[in-house]
Amino acid sequence: QLNYDPTVAPMDAYCLYWLVNLAVGVPLDGYYTDAANALGDKTPAEAEEVINTLKTLDFNTIDTVAIMYDATDYLSGNAMYSDENPTDPTQFTGNLEASIEVLQNYYPQIRIIVMSPTYAYAVDENGDYVSSDMYIYNGRDVLSTYVIKECYSANIHSVSFMDNLYGSITEDNADEYLVDNLHLNVKGRKLIAKRFEY
């Protein structure tokens, strides 16, 4: 069990790992109070609603949990994985794997579907949109490698994986579905929802 330190990275309180722990009943109220105090007006607008929902939702009544990452980890140059500790929640895939393990331990009956990021443009030093298959942040890797690692993490935990990077919003059609380099427009959201139905 890691301890959360709001003085280092207060936004981490809202990452998947800590939210899943909150959902299974780990008492984390102090974490979120500390995070909100540290973030001030940068606290996510929906934070209180999400926290209250996760604390009160009966996951014994839930059939399926869908987990969808966008390309923020790639765009931020966050660390992707650790061979020494594959469930290190400070890593992109470690956070996912640790979260899946918590859900599977507490609610083995729930089907978990991991949904990959859709395509997102990288932004170069001049502020121009460039291919995320060509641009690397913080010496990490390209967006497609994040997705490949995410798929691997889903597979080793025997959960479903939905590939949005190549299966829905791609480099070829991204202009039609994004409002900027990352965020989906209404048409893009509908496309992902339609694909999720299958």
Model-derived segments and their meaning:
Residues 96-100, 144:
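Generic structural signal for well-ordered alpha-helices
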Residues 117-198:
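Catalytic His-Asp segment of secreted/periplasmic serine-dependent ester chemistry enzymes
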Residues 63-68, 111-116, 157-160:
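Structural recognition of the beta-strand scaffold that forms the well-ordered cores
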